[in-house]
Amino acid sequence: MKRTISIIAAGLLFLFPAISNAQVAITAVPFLQIEPDSRGAGMGNTGVAIADNASALFWNPAGLAFQKGSNQASITHSNWLANFNVSDLFYDYVVGKYYIEGIGTIGAHLTYLNLGEQIETYEDGPEPISRFNSYEVALGGSYGYQVSKNFAVGSSLRLIYSSLASGTSVSAQKVNPGSSVAVDLSFLYKTDIFALGGRDAQFSFGSNLSNIGPGIQYTDNAQKDPLPQLLRFGWAFHLDLDDEGINRITLANDISKIMARTKPVYTTDNDGSIDTSMVASGPIEALFNSWSSFERFDGQKTIEVGLLQQFMIGAGLEYWYADQFALRAGYYYEDPNNGDREYITFGAGIRYSFLGVDFSYIKTLESDHPLANTLRFSLLIDF
């Protein structure tokens, strides 16, 4: 894939936002928000209250505490932004969980987003200056602890490395790789199985505050971009449709919000001029100052994003037959002023012996949306 510096610069606008008088919520490394498993993606990006397989490491690591006596590995692949028809723009997620008697279930994951080969050119001509590859990667581990029969807590630790335009310059500033470390904190509550209309049912509720950590610095100055610290909470309802539990459905709903802010810092040069740089609010500070509106530049004008507009909503339905065949559907929504992603999702899964395969498909409401026709494929292996 070969893209000129104009496309690179357009992407880096997210890293070097226009300065406004209000705090803004632009974050670095948004690849950490990509829902990694085809099951949750097929259910409208839901999973914080389900978290019953290896991908609990992403959705809710507390879910590991309820997964006793089972081991699993999974890999997900997606040709990201398929509408761009670019072969080396892809996303991979590898995850595994392992149960240790007397300790519990632990897990590890690797997330990789390849952005392909870039070409830096002069502003006044197509002559190449340099070529480089852009990619982002995260590596982490998780653990869930069962506090009681129905309640568990969990945590993850991950290392993050982002190499977008290393060695190039943007606005006379040299761009370096960025790195950081992040923590997730979560809980999951499951009711006892109860009877509903003569059928077994269960309700669960969970929350996960992910990517808690210091901002990433790409340039030599003090500018830092916040991590996509995300608060996700939701519920799930499981119901057997017959006495034997052969037919089963799950309804799920996730609500999430970015808990991050950048703020301007002003310094005075020796000649009296004032320089302004954007610095990420600390993760604890952002938990308190993210509950208000913020302003951002949409390319043409400055717009205000209200608090309710900052929430992202996903809802999904899953049907299982004999724990072997699954069908899924869902809906995902973001406000037009805050991401503007709205689409329906479809998915299916099959389980046979120790193997499982899931896939999901995104049907955007706009035919030319970058996420249109995005497919994810996941392979699961129990051992």
Feature names for model-found ranges:
Residues 10-11, 54:
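Residue-level detector of alpha-helical transmembrane segments in integral membrane proteins
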Residues 23-383:
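Subset of outer-membrane beta-barrel
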Residues 16-22:
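Sec/Tat signal peptide C-region and signal peptidase I cleavage site
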Residues 2-10:
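Sec-dependent signal peptide recognition
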Residues 2-3, 17, 121, 140:
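A detector of low-complexity, intrinsically disordered, Ser/Thr/Gly/Pro/Ala-rich segments
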Residues 11-12, 69:
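Repetitive helical segments and hydrophobic/amphipathic motifs
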